[in-house]
């Protein structure tokens, strides 16, 4: 039986761009990832899918890259030939993943092993968990409702495309929904439908398999885990963001120039994002906190550095839908180029409450790492002492309790 994942390209581009840096610059790094479901409740306990998940993981770990897939990766100018040679030999190892349950019906997943392996599991496992969960809830009415919502989005994008002023910076969206999609076939249907409705607006997808299949641009640079790893590498904690950005610049020499800002919060990020980085990077990505406040801070920072912000890109990717994205574009279009990565609202808007699931890096080389998100609910670590130390080092206040 073919598994839910049938190609190792069926993941987000940034897994490849981050793994290339890991292979070239710190290949010996060991890491631990842990699964969380942030939903207060689910229709049925996630523990119920444990056995099916184990079967899917076994199938996933049989996959290898095909020559056609490797040729596609080789065609991306920022992917280096030695990395493709490595991927030709690559196979995920099942022994690095443990799946368990607890007496509250929760699903526990731990990935522990070399980062060059562990990092690559994340998107696959999240997509598998989603598809297994929603498979039991699927009815013709669910698909019908999903289609109704999708057609409404397509109609809205047509309206926006017609209203765009060609003399203004364009409104561009991308699919960022692989990790929480309903299923692959639905994700492809969504992208095809929106591309047909508004080809001038749909810029691409983070999913490499679908980018290749549909002939559109694969989108992505870095995730939080890349920057977090530097909290445990051979640099002073205070300098981890600078070290991570320097490492990225060394690898990509001007390509993939969008920096993620919320590992220890926007204010702490901007203290490290000096003139050197501000000139080198094409722009910034927002993934937590108030996007308007965040963008205004970015604008003030570029103004202070005497950089024309209209040459820079703000990418937004936190809980977006088309209306929120369009409103943000209207607010920032005269000051920045903008881009919007829309995830769950595109690929899993079927009428059911989506799963809010994550698989996050919590340790690197045996040392805790953490994210001090601009949204308190997104902060994740298994070490409260380290979290407090990180707050102290970067002068990040404790979030106010409601």
Curated annotation (Swiss-Prot):
Origin organism lineage: Bacteria, Pseudomonadati, Pseudomonadota, Betaproteobacteria, Neisseriales
Phosphohistidine PTM positions: 224
GO CC terms in record: cytosol
NCBIfam families tied to this protein: NAPRTase (TIGR01514), PRK05321.1 (NF003704)
Keyword Phosphoprotein: yes
A single GO molecular function term of this UniProt record: nicotinate phosphoribosyltransferase activity
SUPFAM superfamilies with a match to the protein in the record: Nicotinate/Quinolinate PRTase C-terminal domain-like (SSF51690), Nicotinate/Quinolinate PRTase N-terminal domain-like (SSF54675)
Gene name for this UniProt entry: pncB
Superkingdom of this protein's organism: Bacteria
Stated name of the protein: Nicotinate phosphoribosyltransferase
Phosphoprotein listed as a keyword: yes
Native source organism of the sequence: Neisseria meningitidis serogroup A / serotype 4A (strain DSM 15465 / Z2491)
Protein family (similarity comment): Belongs to the NAPRTase family.
